């Protein structure tokens, strides 16, 4: 009886820890809302800059759509990685990978860490662990997330008008993300297909 009581108490504590108060939720969403206005370098097929929020949403959709290829992966964890991966840009804006310096990365990491630590538990601890796992890129989920993150950007460039590309992107469309897909034949094939689409787009001139 006593053991059962202890288990019930432990469950009650966990439920209390996991509760995010309504006001804190609204404040947290207000930070995330900034990503709707934070534009990325790439354009959409409609001719406007895409937002960080749009990139993150489609990245999460990609993760879901390819999940059958990785039955051993934890889809819930993978989706969380995709959803939170660019929240740091709510504080700094998006800086293209080819322009981002180590100082930029350090500033973003510091601001993000401060914000994450302001969240209630277990969200602060879970997000801290997820960011560390994503940075290490040793787990299957982290590898899938990073490969798709790069590939989503490449696909978006293929969907934009060639007139919006800057000179260095002609090479980046051939090489960007190549080092992130070797863990999976599926990801390698997907990257190859996107590269062929880029070549066809360049040849067509549109």
Model-predicted segments: where are they?
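Active-site helical microenvironments for divalent-metal-assisted chemistry
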Residues: 14-206
């Amino acid at each position: 009886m006593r053991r059962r009581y202890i288990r019930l108490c432990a469950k009650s504590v966990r439920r209390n820890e996991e509760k995010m108060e309504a006001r804190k939720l609204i404040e947290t969403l207000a930070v995330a809302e900034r990503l709707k206005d934070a534009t990325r370098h790439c354009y959409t097929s409609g001719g406007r800059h895409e937002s960080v929020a749009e990139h993150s949403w489609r990245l999460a959709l990609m993760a879901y759509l390819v999940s059958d290829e990785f039955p051993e992966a934890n889809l819930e964890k993978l989706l969380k990685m995709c959803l939170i991966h660019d929240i740091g840009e709510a504080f700094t804006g998006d800086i293209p990978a080819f322009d981002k310096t180590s100082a930029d990365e350090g500033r973003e990491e510091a601001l993000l860490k401060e914000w994450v630590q302001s969240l209630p538990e277990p969200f602060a601890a879970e997000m801290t662990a997820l960011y560390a796992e994503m940075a290490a890129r040793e787990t299957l989920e982290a590898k899938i997330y990073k490969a798709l993150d790069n590939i989503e950007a490449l696909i978006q460039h293929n969907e934009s008008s060639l007139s919006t590309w800057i000179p260095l992107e002609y090479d980046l469309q051939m090489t960007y993300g190549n080092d992130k897909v070797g863990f999976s034949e599926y990801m390698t094939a997907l990257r190859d297909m996107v590269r062929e689409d880029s070549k066809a787009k360049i040849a067509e001139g549109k």
